A protein has these predicted regions:
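Aromatic-anchored segments of alpha-helical transmembrane domains
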Residues: 19-26, 90-97, 156-170, 213-229, ...
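Juxtamembrane "helix-exit" motif on the non-cytosolic side of transmembrane helices
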Residues: 31-35, 99-106, 165-174, 222-238, ...
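Transmembrane alpha-helical segments and their boundary/interface "anchor" motifs
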Residues: 43-44, 50-61, 68-99, 103-132, ...
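Interfacial loop-to-helix transition and helix-capping segments at the boundaries
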Residues: 45-57, 113-128, 169-190, 222-256, ...
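Structural signal for the C-terminal ends of transmembrane alpha-helices
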Residues: 66-74, 138-146, 193-203, 260-269, ...
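Alpha-helical transmembrane segments of multi-pass integral membrane proteins
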Residues: 96, 229-343
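Solvent-exposed interhelical
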Residues: 134-160, 196-215
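Loop-centered beta-sheet repeat module
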Residues: 151-202
């Protein structure tokens, strides 16, 4: 994407979102969220940080809705190839590391999962994003065909079915295909939300956005407290995860507020804007490196976030350092990967794939009248 078409505020949000994803994984996958006694001040502070960071994945997807919703034409096969190649590289890299470390046995099944990561759901986000990207021409046709009233109705129905119904009746998530937000169907809703904001030039004052983000996050923490009591009392396994899912209404409100807040931000310094534009495209690699199914448990066992027994101040200091280090290493590794990608002249292959796909589609569908 050319720099002049990129939004410095949104690209800053892309970087921040990835750091927040690492933070969220540290509290969840890394075990810090369960290190302190349940109900203690430290316990709830960790989960408040988790909820504040929960918007990150939604915002990351919404960026695609903003950038891609005005694109015309068929899906770009070259871009699909780029996504697939990057996921495959990190899948094989982390698989080799895991096998070498003894964390994963070398078997036909594990090798097949590594070789076909988008089909094995080794990276749930990558699989869902790939399917969403494949659907972009259809999603854009919907975006461009609806008037404002119809569009509002679409969003209202989608949120009622997926956010409200999918949370209150969490045991029925398979019927709504939302799976607590771990689904390409939920990504469609996020895409439509961001596309709506762009199509109708929705703007909200920054102060109000910040207030809505903090208020919705506070509501998310309260809902988690309540859901934890209900889950423990009634043995409703999975209720807490549904209440704090990506699709939960408070998470959606906080995500929209964060998105609209960064829409108002424009970096004026050429120096910092160049750095943001350099780092932001590497963010996806940070996720692929640190959250592979093959090495996730190994990584967080090595980091050992609960080493201080959940004690608040040392744990927060250690968490901050660990999150920043993981993010920095991830950005550095992906910078190397992107250079290797260019050295192998794979961007030229993307162009050829786009041209080939266009010819095939023209032969199948025919040209416009």
């Amino acid at each position: 994407m050319e720099e002049q078409k990129r939004h410095s505020g949104f690209e800053t949000m892309r970087i921040l979102s990835m750091v927040m994803i690492v933070l969220m994984h540290g509290i969840g996958h890394g075990g810090l969220g369960s290190a302190a006694p349940q109900g203690s001040a430290a316990f709830w502070i960790y989960w408040l940080l988790f909820i504040l960071a929960r918007v990150s994945t939604n915002c990351f997807v919404m960026l695609s809705g903003y950038y891609l919703s005005e694109r015309k034409g068929a899906v770009r096969a070259g871009r699909l190839f780029r996504i697939g190649a990057q996921v495959w590289f990190y899948s094989m890299l982390t698989f080799c590391v895991a096998v070498k470390a003894g964390a994963v046995p070398l078997s036909a099944i594990s090798l097949l999962r590594a070789l076909l990561p988008l089909t094995s759901n080794g990276y749930w986000f990558a699989s869902a994003y790939f399917l969403m990207y494949l659907s972009v021409p259809v999603l854009n046709a919907v975006v461009q065909s609806l008037d404002r009233r119809q569009y509002k109705t679409l969003l209202l129905v989608a949120l009622l079915l997926q956010s409200v119904w999918g949370t209150l009746f969490y045991w029925a998530t398979d019927e709504t295909f939302v799976n607590n937000g771990y689904s390409f169907i939920w990504f469609y809703t996020l895409y439509f939300m961001a596309a709506y904001f762009r199509k109708y030039r929705v703007t909200v004052p920054s102060g109000l956005c910040l207030l809505a983000y903090l208020a919705a996050s506070a509501a998310g923490l309260f809902n988690r407290m309540l859901a934890l009591r209900v889950e423990n009392a009634l043995h409703l396994n999975g209720f807490v995860n549904a209440v704090n899912g990506y699709q939960a209404l408070d998470t959606v409100i906080a995500s929209a507020a964060m998105f609209l807040l960064f829409q108002n931000i424009h970096i004026r310094s050429d120096y910092w804007r160049r750095w943001v534009f350099r780092l932001a495209p590497l963010s996806f690699g940070v996720y692929l490196l640190h959250d592979s199914d093959f090495t996730r448990a190994l990584l967080w066992r090595l980091v050992d976030l609960p080493r201080f027994g959940g004690a608040l101040l040392p744990s927060l200091a250690y968490l901050t350092g660990a999150v920043l280090l993981i993010a920095v290493v991830g950005y550095a590794v992906d910078a190397v990967y992107q250079r290797l990608y260019r050295l192998l002249h794979l961007p030229a292959l993307e162009t050829k794939l786009d041209a080939l796909t266009a010819r095939i589609l023209q032969n199948i569908v025919g040209s416009k009248e």
